[in-house]
């Protein structure tokens, strides 16, 4: 998400971008994740994160997605789920929507219950849940403590074998939300005309 928008600072000639589950500035990623790990302490740490990024990345550290939006005439599609627990929706989508909701260059797709890593998947395809439920039963059937350090290698091999023997690759590979991807294609096709 962040990268495809930030690149507009350097390549304003890009015709269209689709930003998924992203954030406005690089430090937002640390802040969003840090809130769940450190609570409000993250706000005291954020200035140090920004200084570190400035030393490490120089001028690039201060770039934002919104700077990129202002630097281009590209069409922008922003997609995020309200329940994203990796990057909070307030770090990107909400800010962008507030500023650009009336700008015809922008298209917004907001989901309520797709999280971060499942945003592209069809919510009606339950195969992942089915596979995980069976996997959990398999875990319970093991005759050893798979979390113990001495069983780490054994578990790695057993897990790989279980997955190879039980994963239905056809069902797994058809989890994408095809209607969403048709929207993506339509968006790009319209933008490049």
Question: Which functions belong to the PLM regions below?
Answer:
Residues 72-73, 78-84:
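Short beta-strand/loop motif that positions the catalytic acidic residue
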Residues 74, 88-99, 123-124:
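Short alpha-helix in the alpha/beta-hydrolase fold that links the catalytic acid
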Residues 6-58:
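Hydrolase active-site cap/lid region
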Residues 109-114:
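Short glycine-rich catalytic loops that host catalytic nucleophiles or stabilize transition states
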Residues 123-193:
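Catalytic active-site module of serine/aspartate enzymes centered on a nucleophile-bearing elbow/loop
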Residues 1-2:
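Catalytic nucleophile loop
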Residues 52-68, 74:
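Active-site nucleophile elbow and catalytic-triad environment of alpha/beta-hydrolase enzymes
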Residues 82-87, 116-118:
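Acidic catalytic loop of the alpha/beta-hydrolase fold
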């Amino acid at each position: 998400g962040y990268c495809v928008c930030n690149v507009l600072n350097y390549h304003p000639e890009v015709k269209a971008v689709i930003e998924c589950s992203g954030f406005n500035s690089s430090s937002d990623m640390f802040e969003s994740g840090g809130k769940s790990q450190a609570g409000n302490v993250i706000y005291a740490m954020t200035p140090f994160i920004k200084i570190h990024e400035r030393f490490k990345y120089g001028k690039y550290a201060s770039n934002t997605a919104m700077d990129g939006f202002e630097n281009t005439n590209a069409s922008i599609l922003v997609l995020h789920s309200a329940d994203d627990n990796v990057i909070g929706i307030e770090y990107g989508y909400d800010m962008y929507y507030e500023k650009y909701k009336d700008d015809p260059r922008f298209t917004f797709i907001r989901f309520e219950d797709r999280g971060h890593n499942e945003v592209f998947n069809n919510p009606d395809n339950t195969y992942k849940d089915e596979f995980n439920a069976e996997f959990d039963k398999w875990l319970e059937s093991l005759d050893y403590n798979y979390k113990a350090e001495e069983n780490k290698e054994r578990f790695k091999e057993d897990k790989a074998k279980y997955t190879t023997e039980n994963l239905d690759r056809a069902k797994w590979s058809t989890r994408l939300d095809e209607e969403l991807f048709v929207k993506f294609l339509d968006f790009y096709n319209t933008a490049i005309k």
